[in-house]
């Protein structure tokens, strides 16, 4: 059986081409002024999953730019871990002392998003979004330190979109192993299981995470979120379902081809 190739969106392709240049970020009038301050915090010297922390931040921001997100959401992508978070110990700005500095370079709206994204539980956020726990207006209640914190529909939409871009930029089979069952990760004794976390592992594509990103994407169809931000142009603009079984099957088929010893041509 021969499957048709997915049609290429000419407008999407035209937007993506300039972003392949190494210097694209320095030419972006909304993001370029922030870049020197971020780079001065040595983000290019920190390892992060499949590259450096700088590589990751720029990659997330590139995706958000292709998706035509507004300035504050793109800046959230560029700065999404600079206050640190539960996943990575990479504090580039002290949230207790340097919020004013980040507000100065990024603006109040973007800094507010960055601070919330770094200090609220992203695990709890993903769990609740995937569990369809959004309120009727699209807001979401998170618990922190025994108290409820309500994210507005705009914050929820921004966090979903940035979470999608953040995850797809970095996730491969190594994360499947060390963050098994994310967002419901179970603690494992490091001494007993250290070999499973050897980087980079077999470098397979993820066998489960695209399905989870699809779940986040479909949440953007909630009536309270649907028109809040530009809809990412993935999964048929976040309307198409991808089952876990289909993702696993596609990954297995892809990997079986990759591991063949001979190229798929006549010798």
Regions found by a protein language model. Give the residues of each.
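Short amphipathic alpha-helical segments that mediate assembly, nucleic-acid/protein binding
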Residues: 10-13, 31, 155, 209, ...
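Short helix-capping and inter-helix turn/linker motifs at the boundaries of alpha-helical repeat units
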Residues: 51, 149, 244-248
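N- or domain-start disorder-to-order transition segments that initiate the globular core
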Residues: 2, 6-57, 252-253
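Repeat-mediated protein-protein interaction surfaces in helical alpha-solenoids
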Residues: 229-242
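Amphipathic alpha-helical repeat scaffolds of TPR domains
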Residues: 245-263, 267
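Divalent metal-dependent catalytic cores for phosphoryl transfer on phosphate-bearing substrates
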Residues: 40-47, 60-203, 209-216
């Amino acid at each position: 059986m021969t499957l048709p190739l997915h049609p290429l969106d000419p407008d999407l392709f035209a937007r993506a081409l300039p972003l392949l240049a190494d210097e694209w970020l320095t030419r972006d009038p909304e993001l370029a002024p922030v870049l020197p301050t971020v780079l001065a915090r040595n983000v290019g010297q920190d390892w992060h999953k499949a590259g450096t922390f700088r590589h990751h931040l720029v990659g997330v921001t590139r995706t958000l730019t292709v998706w035509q997100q507004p300035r504050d959401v793109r800046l959230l992508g560029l700065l999404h871990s600079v206050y640190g978070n539960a996943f990575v110990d990479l504090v580039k700005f002290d949230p207790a002392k340097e919020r004013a500095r980040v507000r100065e370079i990024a603006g109040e709206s973007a800094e507010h998003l960055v601070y919330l994204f770094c200090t609220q539980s992203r695990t709890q956020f993903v769990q609740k979004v995937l569990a369809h726990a959004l309120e009727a207006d699209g807001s979401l209640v998170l618990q922190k330190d025994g108290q409820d914190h309500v994210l507005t529909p705009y914050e929820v939409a921004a966090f979903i979109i940035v979470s999608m871009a953040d995850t797809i930029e970095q996730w491969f089979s190594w994360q499947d192993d060390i963050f098994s069952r994310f967002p419901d990760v179970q603690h494992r004794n490091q001494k007993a299981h250290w070999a499973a976390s050897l980087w980079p592992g077999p470098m397979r594509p993820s066998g489960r995470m695209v399905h989870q990103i699809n779940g986040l994407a479909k949440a953007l169809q909630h009536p309270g979120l649907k028109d809040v931000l530009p809809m990412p142009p993935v999964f048929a603009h976040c309307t198409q379902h991808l089952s876990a079984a289909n993702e696993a099957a596609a990954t297995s088929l892809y990997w079986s081809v990759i591991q063949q010893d001979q190229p798929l041509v006549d010798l």
